């Protein structure tokens, strides 16, 4: 291939089956705290060669999709058709790229190296698929074992499958609708396209049965991370402060570009720290006029959503407010309840404390308020 073609990913997530259990289609079941679909989206979206990720969903799955991939920047989902081929055609029509990688949502564990191999293989073929050589003995039979089937040259074909978009779209449109294809490579070959085999990966196994999800959960064993946030704001003229999302009357106000809620700022940094996502200033720079006077609850909600997008689960947060005045004690319960509501936690998962510096330092001189927060979050081990 010449030049640098644009590359998009197309995730087929239109299935309606619930035989894997869980009460929802398998692409929306959660493993490691994150929907199967979200794992697939993230694996493709973080690859530097892929410019966009388009998801095809089933009719009536809009809410499930929104919940699964919330917090991510994606094009609107496309609604698929009655068959997988119909869904792929709908998705291909919505994609604007030279090359497309078509992936089954039920394969959440996609190594970047597989994507690299697929893209490279298109230099010498019309399409490329990842596959693993069959290692087990194959045999015919029902209740009784029949004859063995020679396994030489047999492969288990996986996804994603890579093609030039125009080629695979033409192949799908030319396919006999009376027949149902098992994958896109079958459609491509029937249209005369060459399809290369690249090395697949055992982690790309498709999730189908309840036992598959049990194995995936073991793979996604959660680990605990703890991070700290700290913030300071000085006093200025005013008649009250915002602390932990609660308005408290006072003879002064806190100075800051936003509403200067020092408690929520510290807590936001703590949450961002658990997923190594920088600090509040990198997401909401004080030089940006959009955040002038902004409600800091928005900042905390953003950090919460980023943690969720990473598959994280917030277990506990601890907040210490350091000041001589105003007195925090009378407002402690309200602050705790407000933070719990913002993070979707119970009151028992939020600790709010207050202390002074015994009249030492800037807080002791009543020049401002400091806050320190600690967040404990479970995240997937991979």
Curated annotation (Swiss-Prot):
This is Bifunctional enzyme IspD/IspF. Pathway: Isoprenoid biosynthesis; isopentenyl diphosphate biosynthesis via DXP pathway; isopentenyl diphosphate from 1-deoxy-D-xylulose 5-phosphate: step 2/6; Isoprenoid biosynthesis; isopentenyl diphosphate biosynthesis via DXP pathway; isopentenyl diphosphate from 1-deoxy-D-xylulose 5-phosphate: step 4/6. GO terms for biological process: isopentenyl diphosphate biosynthetic process, methylerythritol 4-phosphate pathway; terpenoid biosynthetic process. It comes from Rhizorhabdus wittichii (strain DSM 6014 / CCUG 31198 / JCM 15750 / NBRC 105917 / EY 4224 / RW1). It comes from the Bacteria. SUPFAM superfamilies: IpsF-like, Nucleotide-diphospho-sugar transferases. The keyword Nucleotide-binding does not apply. Keywords: Isoprene biosynthesis, Lyase, Metal-binding, Multifunctional enzyme, Nucleotidyltransferase, Transferase. Its EC number is 2.7.7.60, 4.6.1.12. It catalyses: 2-C-methyl-D-erythritol 4-phosphate + CTP + H(+) = 4-CDP-2-C-methyl-D-erythritol + diphosphate; 4-CDP-2-C-methyl-D-erythritol 2-phosphate = 2-C-methyl-D-erythritol 2,4-cyclic diphosphate + CMP. Residues 1-225 are annotated as: 2-C-methyl-D-erythritol 4-phosphate cytidylyltransferase. A divalent metal cation binds at residues 231, 233, 265. The keyword Lyase applies. GO terms for molecular function: 2-C-methyl-D-erythritol 2,4-cyclodiphosphate synthase activity; 2-C-methyl-D-erythritol 4-phosphate cytidylyltransferase activity; metal ion binding.
């Amino acid at each position: 291939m010449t030049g640098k073609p644009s590359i998009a990913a197309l995730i087929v997530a239109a299935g309606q089956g619930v035989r894997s259990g869980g009460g929802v289609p398998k692409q929306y079941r959660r493993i490691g705290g994150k929907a199967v679909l979200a794992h697939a989206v993230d694996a493709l979206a973080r690859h530097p060669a892929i410019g966009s990720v388009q998801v095809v969903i089933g009719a009536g799955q809009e809410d499930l999709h929104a919940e699964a991939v919330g917090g991510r920047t994606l094009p609107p989902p496309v609604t698929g058709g009655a068959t997988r081929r119909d869904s792929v055609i709908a998705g291909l029509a919505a994609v604007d790229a030279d090359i497309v990688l078509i992936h089954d949502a039920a394969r959440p564990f996609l190594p970047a190296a597989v994507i690299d191999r697929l893209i490279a293989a298109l230099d010498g073929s019309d399409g490329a698929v990842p596959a693993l050589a069959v290692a087990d003995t194959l045999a015919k039979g029902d209740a009784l074992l029949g004859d063995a089937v020679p396994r030489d040259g047999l492969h288990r074909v996986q996804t994603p499958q890579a093609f030039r978009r125009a080629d695979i779209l033409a192949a799908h449109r030319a396919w006999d609708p009376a027949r149902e294809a098992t994958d896109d490579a079958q459609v491509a070959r029937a249209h005369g396209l060459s399809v290369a085999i690249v090395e697949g990966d055992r982690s790309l196994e498709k999730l189908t049965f309840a036992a598959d999800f049990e194995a995936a959960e073991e793979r996604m064993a959660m680990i605990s991370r703890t991070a700290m946030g700290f913030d300071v704001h000085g006093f200025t003229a005013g008649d009250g402060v915002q602390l932990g999302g609660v308005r408290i009357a006072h003879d002064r106000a806190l100075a800051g570009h936003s509403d200067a809620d020092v408690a929520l700022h510290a807590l936001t940094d703590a949450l961002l720290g658990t997923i190594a996502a920088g600090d509040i200033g990198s997401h909401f720079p004080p030089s940006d006029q959009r955040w002038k006077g902004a409600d800091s609850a928005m900042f905390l909600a953003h950090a919460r959503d980023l943690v969720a997008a990473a598959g994280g689960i917030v277990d506990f947060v601890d907040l210490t407010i350091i000041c001589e005045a105003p007195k925090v004690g009378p407002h402690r319960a309200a602050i705790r309840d407000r933070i719990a509501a913002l993070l979707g936690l119970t009151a028992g998962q939020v600790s709010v404390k207050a202390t002074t510096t015994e009249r030492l330092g800037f807080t002791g001189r009543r020049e401002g308020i400091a806050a320190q927060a600690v967040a404990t979050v479970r995240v997937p081990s991979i």
